[in-house]
A protein has these predicted regions:
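Anionic group-transfer/hydrolysis microenvironments
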Residues: 6, 34, 114
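N-terminal FAD cofactor-binding segment of flavoenzymes
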Residues: 44-86
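Glycine-rich FAD pyrophosphate-binding loop
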Residues: 22-48
Length: 137
């Protein structure tokens, strides 16, 4: 089979790219050498989170996956910046910013990486224009 676009890498960014191209009508093959770990308690699960700021949330809405994510998203209402530069690796200055000072919306939303992989994999399965082949390199 021929594809318009091949995405090499089925992590969060690769699956997001595949979903975006697929939503635009391109035929897409997304490959990754390993299947995504989609269960929080599975060995090797990525327990970190990713923050999506407002423009990224709009992009996720545009490509059709935000409805799958919104119920799991934690608002990023306060952003704390810490200065730990210099010779000693210690925090010297911190500053907190509250999103309500500039907007009715939070700065963004945090989502667990393992959950993003699960939801993106399920979303790709529902796109007729995208073939997701984990376990392929």
């Amino acid at each position: 089979m021929e594809y318009d676009i091949i995405v090499s890498g089925g992590g969060i960014a690769g699956m997001a790219a595949a979903a975006a191209f697929g939503a635009d009508g391109y035929s897409v093959l997304c490959v990754d050498p390993a299947p995504p770990i989609t269960d929080r308690d599975a060995e090797g699960a990525d327990l970190r989170s990713t923050a999506f700021l407002q423009p990224a949330q709009a992009f996720l809405e545009e490509i059709g996956i935000w409805p799958r994510l919104v119920q799991h998203a934690m608002p990023l209402q306060v952003m704390r910046i810490a200065d730990a530069g210099g010779q000693e690796p210690e925090i010297r200055v911190t500053k907190a910013f509250d999103a309500s000072d500039i907007s009715d919306l939070p700065f963004g939303w945090n989502l667990p990486n393992w959950l993003l992989r699960r939801e993106f994999a399920a979303h790709l399965e529902g796109l007729k224009t995208v073939t997701f082949k984990p376990g392929t390199s």
